[in-house]
A protein has these predicted regions:
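RNA pseudouridine synthases
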Residues: 1-225
Length: 225
């Protein structure tokens, strides 16, 4: 097991989720990050019996980056409240096709999901059954045919970043489900990473920021696309 621990104390643990890995078990029976973290804690601290681990949020399976778990029920309750009231700052970076017309902008869409196809549509009108989605982006760097964007997520809807960027004509590299022309050269997920989480520590009056670096090969793919 090759688990990348980004931050750990007695109350919480943050780890790096690789592309293609599930955060939580599903019907596929594939290995999940949740189970890996429980195994890591059980063995590191020689804990008998079941290990408590609070699942606080998720990332889409093709997405990689920072994931936060609670190690106590008190921490789980307090951190879950921060996720519910949107006080946790979530930063993503992504490589997209094309060059956005604006160097920075806020996008608001209403999302509807086709559960059979597992795809989300983003539209400007509020239709019945849709969920409001908001994000802000900044263009960090441009290449010949692609751009690197920094995304600040205001809401946390499934497939939100993927569908909203596709809706404005800039699909994420490797994300063929949302309009990318092909997979990444390594065929490993999509070029979207949760790079930063900032939250209030559940027992101390301090802010914690957990970060992860973008892989160098994504820059190479962006330059060559």
């Amino acid at each position: 097991m090759n688990l990348r621990v980004l931050y750990e104390d007695n109350h919480l643990i943050s780890v790096f989720k690789p592309s293609r890995m599930l955060v939580q078990d599903d019907v596929t029976g594939d290995a999940s990050l949740y189970d890996q973290v429980k195994y890591y804690l059980k063995n590191k601290y020689h804990k008998p019996g079941n290990v408590f681990l609070g699942l606080l949020h998720r990332l889409d399976r093709p997405v990689c980056g920072t994931i936060l778990f609670a190690r106590t029920s008190k921490a789980a309750a307090r951190l879950s409240e921060q996720f519910r009231n949107h006080s946790i700052k979530k930063i993503y970076h992504t490589f997209v096709f094309g060059h956005p017309a604006k160097k920075a902008d806020t996008l608001v869409h209403f999302l509807t999901k086709d559960h059979e196809l597992n795809i989300t549509s983003a539209q400007l009108e509020d239709v019945e059954g849709s969920l409001r989605a908001e994000l802000s982006y900044e263009v960090v760097e441009t290449f010949a045919n692609t751009s690197l964007l920094k995304i600040t997520l205001k809401t946390g809807r499934p497939h939100q970043i993927r569908s909203q960027l596709s809706a404005i004509g800039h699909p994420i590299m490797g994300d063929m489900k949302y309009g990318a022309p092909d997979l990444l050269p390594d065929q490993n997920g999509i070029a979207l990473m949760a790079t930063e989480l900032t939250f209030k520590h559940p027992t101390k009056e301090e802010k914690i920021t957990v970060t992860a670096d973008l892989p160098a090969n994504w820059f190479e793919y962006a330059r060559n696309s």
